[in-house]
């Protein structure tokens, strides 16, 4: 892996840029009439389900960042024991579980959780010492993959997932909803990390 020049300020700025991006999505969706959350976005998931899916995985991001900030070692994943994301089938099983959990939440609750998780990410990053946040191999007790990545990279991975997998669908849906190209803030930096 090539060395990547990232600072704690870069990580915090990316979280705030992600917050701005989500605020624009929510505002654009609500700015053109009532939104129930059940509007189909991509033929597979609704608006609320996409947000719930992102939140489900962000809970795991927050858990790992909190473990690093608190020095508590590997956290328990937010999904049931026995589910693992090491294979595509395992990831599909986790996604189905996340989807089932998110269906019990209202759109307002789902959106509120989005911003709460971003706050938790920011707060945890602020508490992790700079060098430990950005040095690979420091937190292998939290996640073995962190042998080659710093804990700060999980923020980048979380952001990349949204903007590679879900942002194009959300932007297309918003554009259709408002009847013109939906202008969203720039994509936050993933710091050059690739998951």
Write out the residue ranges for each language-model feature:
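Short amphipathic alpha-helical segments with heptad-repeat character
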Residues: 12, 16, 51, 55, ...
